UniProtKB/Swiss-Prot annotation:
Effect upon mutating F21L: In strain: Clone pNL4-3
Full protein name: Protein Rev
Record's function text: Escorts unspliced or incompletely spliced viral pre-mRNAs (late transcripts) out of the nucleus of infected cells. These pre-mRNAs carry a recognition sequence called Rev responsive element (RRE) located in the env gene, that is not present in fully spliced viral mRNAs (early transcripts). This function is essential since most viral proteins are translated from unspliced or partially spliced pre-mRNAs which cannot exit the nucleus by the pathway used by fully processed cellular mRNAs. Rev itself is translated from a fully spliced mRNA that readily exits the nucleus.
One BP term from GO: mRNA transport
A Gene Ontology molecular function term of the record: RNA binding
Composition-biased stretches (Basic residues): 36-47
Variant or mutagenesis effect after changing R38D: No effect on KPNB1 binding
Cell compartments where the protein resides: Host nucleus, Host nucleolus; Host cytoplasm
Species the sequence originates in: Human immunodeficiency virus type 1 group M subtype B (isolate BRU/LAI)
Motif interval(s): Nuclear export signal and binding to XPO1: 73-84
Gene of this entry: rev
Region listing for Homomultimerization, in residue ranges: 18-26
InterPro entries: REV_protein
Length: 116
């Protein structure tokens, strides 16, 4: 693995092998039996899958030395965010992504119930 020392590569491979073993130890449920029995087996299987997933995250965070959770992104207050489609709307699917328009004064969306 590029940019890593050999020792951490071995640790990472060991962690991946362990996680692979955990997932292989929980095969999908047998499709035989009554509807209720199949439903119960699927429910228990999904719960085990969730447990394996959380254990896998803990293993990776231990071996990689960092949190599995992403760093929270600081956003401005929702009241100040608006979609501005005045210039070149629809020309590109990614145009304007990443730079939200911020209004100094937020417009009134709902009036007090009177029609104009």
């Amino acid at each position: 693995m590029a940019g890593r020392s050999g020792d951490s590569d071995e640790d990472l491979l060991k962690a991946v092998r362990l996680i692979k073993f955990l997932y292989q130890s929980n095969p999908p449920p047998n499709p035989e039996g009554t509807r209720q029995a199949r439903r119960n087996r699927r429910r228990r299987w999904r719960e085990r899958q969730r447990q394996i997933h959380s254990i896998s995250e803990r293993i990776l965070s231990t071996y990689l030395g960092r949190s599995a959770e992403p760093v929270p992104l600081q956003l401005p207050p929702l009241e100040r965010l608006t979609l501005d489609c005045n210039e070149d709307c629809g020309t590109s699917g990614t145009q304007g992504v990443g730079s939200p328009q911020i209004l100094v004064e937020s417009p009134t969306v709902l009036e007090s119930g009177t029609k104009e």
